[in-house]
Structures are given as structure tokens and as C-alpha cells.
């Protein structure tokens, strides 16, 4: 009979940052007796989850993709944002063969260069500076028809902040004397990741056919009209931008389409609508044979050229476990399932040997303030069963509530989400202790601890650059080390499990045996 395993469990409370000021702080204002007691009585510390400590630009807020890559890799992983910033600064971006090849092919055939992406300074899914560089590259290489299809943010940026970005691009096109903003639409439609194809279809039709609910002469006018309709950036409806006498920007066979988002999860659905021959998310009214370029690899099964292929990461926590014949479980809801699997494994889609996965469906609601508990009850039930099964050496779980409800900007809902999490943590900690296992509780970045922007008074829907908690629950008598970061978690787990740390992991263990 096999011996029951005592699992090393990592619970990631998504968007659960640490901030001592109680003002607009959903975590502080929630009733959290369990987390309060654990923080008071167990070994704990604060760790960095943003900026240079996770391979992002200095003081850049953290995010879920970056957080999970660092958590699983056990080393600082330089993110696409930082990599692209450097490429543009050193001008190697302007000679990237995939990008220049697509532009040159369109130019020589007299075709258009379409550029789409999230027009945002948020730096989570994209950065407008990269899009600006792409526009400049297309113009420098002789493209006459340059069409920008702008997805508006308001989620990783303040809810109404797109005007200055759109103005920057309208000014740039005026300066170049060619090209224009051809369409605007909120990311709610263009960047869905939950198979809500009715939303994606509106973005697809807008770009392929130049057909939308609204049409305006300029992007700024289109945005102001959306605000007058009470639509924040994220929810701006499909709007064609075309002045009297301007050519239609509908896509044609042979045009280039360059997708400037660097984060994969919200880029996949719209990409598949453009490139998959067997696409069945919705009936496409117009199928265009485009020269489609993805900035980074959105998924291994999307077979189009990629300007910046992933750098492979050897010996992530998942791979190291598999090499040592350890069993592991990854478990989360739909919203963060990719994070505990694909991202935690360093961008590897295929599960490792001995790696099981459990996906709990996130509730089908328009926005998660309507159901702040999300699917946490079912997630906890499955997680507790896995902990007590004796089957797993390590379990990685993500609770999305703090982040997904934090993004809505609704304080009462975020408080409810945090209180729900407290109840879940109680059950998980009890289960771990009942089998003599070990538990680390942490977060990938902050969000719910800052629900209002003090400078603007608007709802704060974005992530923060604040530290996150790390708490140990288990039988070992440990002392916490200060100054940690997300990439120290994997080495910490290995140390607690009595395993060797691979040389690729440069993180340090954050608890020492007293």
C-alpha cells in the first residue's frame, strides 16, 4: 500500500496586497479573523510582487501572468514589457525580421498595414509606446495605408483615461502625413478570455468590415461620445473612425495585421477568430486572408509568425517536481486556470509527468461584483479533498476573487470577496494541518487593498505595486527572512520539502528552521 503523502500546498490569493492604510482598503475593512490570526501567530513576511523584483520596469505594478511565471520559475524572469522596452530603446525592434518582413510584403503589394492592440500605458497586456514604435516602423518602411485598431483599457488604467493616448496617436499620424486610427472598442469586447464570443464578434466585425454601432470623424470624438453614453474605456462600443473623404479601413486579402499585445491570455480568442480555418466561436461574416503576426506566442497551436518567441525556462518548479517523481496538482477557476498551469510552468502548455489539473468553472456573470464569492465554495471543496487524498506531494491553487472583484472597483463587493476568502483559507489550513502537511499563503500582486484612486477620486480598478503577504502554516518551527520576492517562493517550497534547489533557481528560501 502506498504511503499517504503530506502535501506542500501553495495558495495564491490573487490580488491580495498588503497596505496598512484602511482608507478604501477592502482587505483591511473586511472581517478576516482567520488571516488575522495566521498573521499574528504564524511565521510570516512581506514580499515584493512588482517592478524590477519580478522583471518589470521599476515601480511597474505586478500582474497575474508575471506573478505566476516568477512564482513557478524560482528566478526573476524578465517580462515581455521590459524586453520590448529595451529592444525599442536600442532600436533592434526596428529590424525585427518578422515585423519588418510583414510590413515590407504589404508595402510591395500596395496593401495596408493594420495594427491592433490595447492602447494603454498600463503595461499589463501591452504598452502604447510599443504600438507607437510599430506605427513609426511601418511609416519608415514606406507603408502608406497604416490603420490602427485601438482597444481601450480602463482596467489596468483609470476607467476614463484613453483620451490622451488617442490624442497622441492622432497627432503622430498627422505628423507622419499618413495612417490613422481606424476603430476604437473597449477591451471588454476585443479581449475576452471566457468564450463570450458575442463580444469578440463585435470587435471582429468592426475591424474586418469597418462596421460598428457608431461612426465618428476622429478617435477623440468617438471616445467623448462613448463617455456621454456613460461607457468607460473598457466598455466603449464598436466605433468606426472615418472622416468624410477618407478611405474605408476594412481588411482585405494580403493586408498585414500585427497584434501588439504581448500577454497571451486575452489575445487568444480574437487571434483565433482571425487565423483558424476551423474557427467556430461565431459565424464569421467576412473571412480575410491576412498576413497575421503575433507579437509574442499566444498559444502553441496558433500557427502564425511570432515576432518574439518565448525564451524557454529550464527547471521550473513543475519540471523539477516531475524529474524527482513527485506528484502535483494545479487547481483554480476558469479566470486563473491558465495562471496556475501555463504561466506557472514557464509558458509550457503540456502538463508534466505526475501533474494533475482541476478546472472549476467561473460563474457566468457580466461582472464579478454581482457574485463576489465566484466559485470559491466548489474550489475549496475540491482542494480540501485533494489535500486529504494523500495523493499529492505539492498542490498549487489560485483563488481569483481579490483580483477579479477588485477590478470592478466596487468596494462592498471586494469586501465580500475578501471575507469569502477568509472562510476558504480556514478550511484549507485545517485540512493541511489534519494530514501533517505544509501550507504557504501568498499573492501574485495587489489589487483589493486599494479600491479608490486618491489622486483622481475615481474607482481604482487596476493592480497595485504594493507588497504581498507570505504566511507559513505547518509543524516546522521557522523564522521568516525579510526582503523576499515572488521568485523566492519555489526555492522556499523545495527547502520545506527537503529537496535540492536546481541551479537555475536563483531565488532564496524565505524561512529558516529555528
UniProtKB/Swiss-Prot annotation:
Pathway: Carbohydrate degradation; glycolysis; pyruvate from D-glyceraldehyde 3-phosphate: step 3/5. Its EC number is 5.4.2.12. Substrate binds at residues 125, 155-156, 187, 193, 263-266, 336. InterPro entries: Alkaline_phosphatase_core_sf, BPG-indep_PGM_N, Metalloenzyme, PGAM_B_sf, Pgm_bpd_ind. One of its GO terms (biological process) is glycolytic process. The active site is at residue 64. Its cofactor is Mn(2+). Pfam families: iPGM_N (PF06415), Metalloenzyme (PF01676). CDD domains: iPGM (cd16010). Mn(2+) 2 binds at residues 14, 64, 444-445. One of its GO terms (molecular function) is phosphoglycerate mutase activity. Keywords: Glycolysis, Isomerase, Manganese, Metal-binding. GO terms for cellular component: cytosol. Mn(2+) 1 binds at residues 403, 407, 463. Gene3D superfamilies: Alkaline Phosphatase, subunit A, BPG-independent phosphoglycerate mutase, domain B. Binds 2 manganese ions per subunit. It catalyses: (2R)-2-phosphoglycerate = (2R)-3-phosphoglycerate. Belongs to the BPG-independent phosphoglycerate mutase family. Monomer. PANTHER family: 2,3-BISPHOSPHOGLYCERATE-INDEPENDENT PHOSPHOGLYCERATE MUTASE. Catalyzes the interconversion of 2-phosphoglycerate and 3-phosphoglycerate. HAMAP family: GpmI. This is 2,3-bisphosphoglycerate-independent phosphoglycerate mutase.
